[in-house]
């Protein structure tokens, strides 16, 4: 019985330490409370996003812009350490649904240079619908401001015209 309790306590301790480290890592990537403008906003997360970030932050790109990732499950956003790969030095995370206008305001979408909306792979056949809703939400947030460029990933070509009408 003592052995079982000891193993349980060790597991609890390890889980607590891991949770603290993950939370600290996520906090270091929160959007700073400064006026950010001209940045890139990436809505939704997928492994394809890593290559996209590497491309926009590559050494051949002279116009370096910070990247703000908006995703409802930040634990899924797995980024290389800032010290290991320079492309990820200026990458921040906003937790929340990218179709939610409050969350988009927190990501400072109205001041963004461009917004890239990736298809949410978890939505399967409804991914394009969610992408269209995200496009509309971005337009609504930016109604008084200059509209950022909106680029949206379309999985089914039959929804392409709907995405264009939504602002992509």
Give short role names for the model-derived ranges.
Residues 1-168:
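Cytosolic regulatory regions of ion transport systems
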């Amino acid at each position: 019985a003592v052995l079982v309790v000891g193993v349980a306590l060790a597991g609890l301790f390890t889980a607590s330490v891991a949770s603290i480290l993950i939370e600290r890592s996520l906090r270091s990537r929160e959007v700073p409370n400064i006026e950010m403008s001209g940045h890139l906003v990436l809505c939704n997360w997928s492994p394809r996003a890593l290559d996209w970030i590497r491309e926009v932050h590559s050494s051949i790109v002279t116009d370096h812009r910070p990247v703000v990732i908006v995703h409802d499950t930040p634990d899924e956003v797995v980024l290389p350490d800032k010290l290991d790969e320079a492309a990820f030095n200026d990458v921040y995370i906003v937790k929340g649904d990218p179709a939610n206008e409050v969350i988009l305001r927190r990501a400072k979408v109205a001041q963004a240079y461009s917004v890239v909306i990736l298809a949410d792979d978890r939505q399967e056949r409804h991914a394009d619908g969610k992408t269209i809703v995200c496009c509309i939400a971005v337009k609504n947030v930016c109604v008084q401001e200059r509209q950022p460029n909106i680029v949206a990933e379309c999985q089914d070509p039959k929804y392409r015209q709907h995405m264009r009408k939504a602002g992509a």
